[in-house]
Amino acid sequence: MQNEVQSICIVGTGFRGLGVFERIYAYAKKNRSTKPIQVHLIDPTTDGPEQYNTRLPDYLLLNIVCGQVSLFPDAVSVPGCPPTTGPSLYEWVRERRLRLTEDGFTIGDTGRDINYGDFLPRRLLGEYLLWFREVIKKEAGLLFEIFEHKAKATNIAKDAYRYAIQLSNSEVIISDYLFITVGQISEPILSSFGYKSKTKYISQPYPLPEQLETVKAEERIAICGLGLTAFDAILTLTIGRGGKIVVKNGVENYIPSGKEPQIVAFSRSGLPFFSRPSLGAPLKYEPIVFNQSAIDGLRNKVGMKLDYDRDILPLIFTEMRVAYHRAKYGRDYGWEKTQKLHTDFRYAFQTGNLEKLLNELDSHDSFVFSHKDYYFEFYDTSAMGFADSTSYENWIRRWLENDLKESRSGTPLSPIKAALEVLREFRDIIRYAVDFGGLTNESAERFFSFHSETLNRIGVGPQKEHTAIVLALMKAGILRICLGPSPEILWDNYLKYWKFSSKVFKLQQVITVDWIYQGSINRRQHIGENSSIVGAMAHQGLLRRYYPESAVNYAVDIDHNFHPINQNGIANERIWVLGLLCEGATFYNGYVTSPDKFVRSQFDADCAVSSIFSQIMQ
């Protein structure tokens, strides 16, 4: 038994799966005398995850700057075993002498050098991901056997200690340890509108541009969504069909190719995403009031389960005000002087005078930053009393113009953007408060139906350049955002078109279109309906929903070590579920890993693999 081969299966080789693979290599390198190991990598795709597919066109960009992307973990994220070292995405493209052409997105041999703060084509991240896989595979192959399976894991059988994984190509893999790192399958969003027809309905957003090739120039298409996936579709139908952006007097203008359809975009909320700001001045600092100690103090005071609106939001809003005034002070008086203000903030907090100090700073500001407006009031479009679609569309245009102005100023010169970045920079503290049942059931339901979407809208938006393109398309009459939130959708089977009717305007807007494109990833799918191994595990009782009564939370139930809980309430300690399948049991699982900082996903992988090797070495 001492020399029995230990088999580890990783189902899904995106960011999470390859993070686990790197950790297995690192631990095997450190513990050379362990039992023989086999690692099985199971994934039907060879071109990377669909959002980062290596065949994507260059105009589909990352919404994070290349200098903030790395698959190689920092030591702080992997305390159990030293990290594998290697280049960040920025260093990787520089090593290959890739250059950025004049249009701002095409990569080639000509043009300017790529900078740390550039938003690069997503296909490059896909290529970097595949390169990382090959680097780890080459080194790890000297330590253990690696088997790659270009297939889908569809079923599972379990005996006392091991698992038999059935693949779509009829292979069966016997495994001692199993990692499920696949994403959730997108549910057609029209089901949330009570309509399930697939007539001229493009229900799967990717791959692009292939999914939109059947849409003709003389047709009209409605895009369900105003976020990143919707932006991808809009760019595919315009820039991807030969349209050009020409800047005149500092304003972007769209020159059509004649191949564009007419585009109408809408969403459930009727609200756009905030665009990502230019980065510059060092805004990072230790939070004054919103930190883990504050969360622990709340739990000691009110109980282990918190109410997000009552307990956590006030801390976040105070921290946003601190960030706003800190950035404003740095802009007006120089960043070297902000440390004194930050010291004043900390002393005021310790002496119970922070609110007084913030109010005093507000009184000297001609523009009073309303954190609640940016978080709440702006987000109920149904209550704004728009007379008609024109007034709503004009509001959208002004909103985008103002946001673009702030994003171009960036965190060095926009106190508003600096304040909003709190929601992104301190996301781990939100996780600390929310994860693993940290909220009451009622609060968790509201968090995952409203707050998580608001946090994403503020912190995970498009590049400012894409917002400028949207404004240019609206001005050119190619794109309209005119229906308001959650319009009524009907299919006219006689006339063969889709009919949209606004619900919140005093004068109703009615529009007909030829096509509907699902421009958002709808992850509200019951795990039992998943066609992969996840659905099979649910049917066999190997896992269950985290909160089965929820109308918005479809996460897999896991313990604090990411082991799935079976139908009898017992953790499967040789299985780990990591990533988007946990969204609801934990918060914000779909993100790109960064260098030189703590990354929770890499920490989780380290803990899981550490536990495997502690068993193997016994």
Predicted feature descriptions by range:
Residues 67-70, 87-92, 207, 291-294:
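Short, solvent-exposed coil/turn linker segments
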Residues 14, 59, 69, 82, ...:
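Compositionally biased, intrinsically disordered low-complexity regions
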Residues 1-56, 107-617:
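Flavin (primarily FAD) cofactor-binding/catalytic cores of flavoenzymes
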Residues 44-45, 55-64, 70, 77:
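Conserved small-residue
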Residues 71-130, 456:
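Conserved N-terminal/central alpha/beta ligand/cofactor-binding core
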